[in-house]
């Protein structure tokens, strides 16, 4: 992969190298314990959490006795970087904040108190991956304290620890690796990636090339799927490039768009100087990796690779301005000796300076690409096992509802949770079906789940009374299980089972197996089950997803009963620059600014046939953005755009489906 060892270690390096190792998230504590046991003088690295604007509002509200619901009313839509002294401007510029009652009582009191504590230290937390290793007792250098799990943690944060010259290692918890392991374990045959090459597998290539990568590590976000389609990624090298150019440093500089155009032959490949062609020809003359800084500094200024790595490190987010000036003079003088014209060498330096601090290490990008290819292979060949693992590990860009719908689009049957069949985790009950795990049921404790799985080994539950007697769940647990359908098929309707559970829980706790009420449970009348729409709503409330149909079915919209005049997501490829009307629930979003500094928004909506991307340019965002405070569903009128074969919708009008299709359209 043409990785530069000097990026890791070189003679001129004054500090320890960067060591980042990813492990499955559910084994990270095990690996930390291993490092503590093996190297002894070890501590986790702390981070110092401060009260941001939203956390200051929450803490102030709680201290003043307000409910979480009241506090969330003003915090949930505020930007994380909101300035509490400038809330009026936020309300005027961000549509979702337009109706927030900043001036009304009691919110004005909460805000006044929050202003006084915003920015103050809140507590010591633990760095997401960092730990420090020493050759002597760490307490000789750093004060320590214990974490709730019993590990020792530094009271200094990352930068002072590095300044002390100690070895820092990042052991990162990665859910994507756990997904891979769980999928392989679930498949009823051995999958050996030392013998299988996902890169050359046709089904895997097609899945990546077409951007059908929801659930796949690192390559599932809307922006990344869009990029995969634009590049028509067909090799490990190109996926490695894509993993880097999606990063903020390359993307925000305009280099990502230049890379796409040059890759597709729509823009000529140019170089600021012929020497750059020697080192940047594979990336169309564009720096996209940290290693590119090393190569350019070496080729243009004659710097050694070790010296060039020192330059790159100095340009990181933790800049040393005095050393930066030294490196700048060294670079420009070296470039001058190599005959580079002044204007050209200054322009090359400007490119390096604006890029180096936010670029991606190629070794990191290549490692990510390898895991991404394996994930794509598993999704292409074992979709049920793969999607069950994604749902179980609760990782990724989307919520469980989006992954359930993706599984449904793959032809996988979604089976609701059931006390006689479900495990704790999601699992593939057969090659084309996923059974929802009891872990997804709200209000259900892990101890109750474990009790259900253990006790039913002695015999399945025959009735609601049998279940209540053997498991003795809390009333809230029994109610949630009934409403989500986990007790369906036990001979009674949901309302009848709920009444029986209610009566059973009103008995004397020490005598629950014997009737102590005048009402005989056996005489409870049978009530009919609720309609399907009510069941669907109950699934949303108890599972935070819909097991039996897409959420828009609540409004009578299904593939078989599609409203006239509406375009499905799967049919967007048939249109180009056409005006259409579409509908969907909100899956995710991204706010950004134009080059003029105006706010705009990208949103991802989903109908039963797929996810589609919608662009709200500043004028439309200001006009309709205020309704984007919930998940929808929404109706969008707009124009379908064709961007290098990828279809998106540019919104011209946005409305809420909650008001009814006919009234919204009119």
Regions found by a protein language model. Give the residues of each.
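OB-fold (S1/OB) nucleic-acid-binding surfaces
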Residues: 594-619
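Alpha-helical scaffold/interaction cores of sigma-54-like transcription cofactors
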Residues: 1-496, 501-509, 513, 590-593
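Hydrophobic core residues within well-ordered beta-strands of beta-rich domains
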Residues: 580-582, 601, 627, 634
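OB-fold/S1-family single-stranded nucleic acid-binding modules
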Residues: 641-664
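Short nucleic-acid-contacting surface segments enriched for D/E, G, S/T with interspersed K/R
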Residues: 620-637
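Hydrophobic beta-strand positions in extracellular immunoglobulin-like domains
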Residues: 586, 638-640
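OB-fold nucleic-acid-binding modules
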Residues: 534-590
């Amino acid at each position: 992969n043409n990785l530069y060892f000097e990026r890791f270690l070189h003679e001129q390096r004054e500090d320890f190298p960067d060591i980042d190792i990813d492990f499955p998230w559910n084994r990270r504590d095990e690996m930390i314990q291993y490092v503590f046991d093996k190297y002894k003088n070890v501590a986790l690295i702390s981070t110092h959490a401060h009260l941001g604007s939203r956390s200051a509002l929450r803490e102030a509200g709680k201290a003043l006795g307000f409910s979480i619901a009241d506090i969330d009313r003003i915090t949930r839509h505020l930007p994380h970087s909101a300035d509490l002294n400038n809330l009026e401007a936020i309300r005027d510029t961000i549509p979702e904040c337009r109706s927030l009652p900043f001036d009304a009582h009691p919110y004005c009191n909460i805000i006044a108190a929050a202003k006084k504590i915003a920015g103050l230290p809140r507590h010591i937390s633990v760095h997401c991956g960092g730990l420090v290793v020493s050759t002597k007792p760490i307490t000789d250098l750093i004060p320590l304290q214990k974490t709730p799990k019993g590990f020792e943690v530094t009271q200094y944060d990352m930068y002072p620890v590095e300044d002390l010259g100690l070895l820092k290692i990042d052991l990162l918890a990665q859910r994507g690796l756990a997904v891979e392991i769980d999928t392989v374990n679930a498949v009823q045959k051995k999958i050996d990636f030392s013998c299988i090459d996902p890169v050359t597998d046709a089904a895997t290539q097609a899945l990546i090339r077409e951007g059908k990568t929801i659930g796949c590590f690192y390559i599932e976000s809307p922006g990344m799927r869009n990029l995969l389609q634009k590049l028509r990624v067909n090799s490990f090298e190109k996926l490695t490039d894509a993993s880097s150019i999606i990063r903020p440093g390359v993307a925000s500089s305009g280099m990502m768009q230049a890379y796409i155009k040059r890759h597709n032959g729509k823009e000529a490949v140019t170089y600021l100087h012929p020497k750059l062609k020697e080192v940047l020809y594979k990336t169309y003359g564009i720096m996209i990796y940290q290693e590119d800084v090393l190569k350019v500094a070496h080729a243009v200024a004659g710097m050694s690779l070790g010296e060039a790595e020192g330059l790159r490190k100095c340009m990181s987010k933790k800049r040393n301005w005095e050393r930066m000036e030294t490196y700048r003079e060294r670079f420009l003088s070296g470039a001058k000796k190599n005959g580079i014209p002044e204007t050209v060498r200054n322009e090359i330096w400007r490119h390096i300076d604006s890029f180096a601090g936010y670029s991606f290490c190629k070794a990191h990008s290549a490692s990510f690409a390898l895991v991404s290819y394996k994930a794509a292979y598993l999704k292409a060949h074992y979709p049920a096992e793969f999607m069950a693992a994604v749902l179980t590990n609760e990782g990724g860009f989307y919520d469980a509802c989006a992954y359930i719908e993706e599984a449904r689009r793959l032809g996988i049957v979604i089976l609701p949770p059931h006390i006689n069949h479900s495990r704790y985790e999601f699992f593939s009950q057969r090659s084309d079906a996923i059974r929802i795990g009891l872990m997804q049921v709200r209000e259900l404790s892990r101890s109750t789940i474990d009790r259900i799985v253990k006790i039913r080994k002695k015999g399945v539950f025959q009735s609601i009374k049998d279940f209540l007697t053997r498991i003795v769940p809390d009333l809230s647990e029994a109610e949630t299980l009934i409403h989500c359908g986990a007790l369906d098929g036990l001979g009674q309707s949901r309302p009848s089972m709920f009444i029986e559970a209610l009566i059973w829980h009103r008995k004397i706790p020490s005598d629950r197996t014997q009737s102590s009420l005048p009402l005989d449970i056996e005489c409870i009348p049978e009530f009919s089950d609720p309609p399907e729409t009510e069941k669907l709503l109950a699934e949303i409330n108890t599972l935070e997803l819909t097991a039996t149909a897409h959420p828009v079915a609540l409004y009578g919209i299904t593939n078989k009963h599609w409203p006239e005049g509406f375009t499905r997501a799967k049919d967007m490829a048939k249109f180009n620059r056409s005006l259409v009307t579409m509908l969907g629930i909100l899956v995710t979003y991204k706010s950004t600014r134009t080059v003029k500094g105006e706010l705009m928004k990208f949103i991802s909506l989903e109908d039963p046939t797929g996810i589609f991307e919608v662009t709200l340019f500043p004028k439309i965002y200001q006009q309709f953005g205020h309704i984007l405070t919930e998940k929808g569903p929404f109706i969008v009128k707009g124009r379908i755009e064709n961007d290098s074969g990828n279809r998106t919708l540019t919104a011209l009008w946005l409305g809420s489906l909650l008001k009814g299709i006919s009234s919204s359209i009119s």
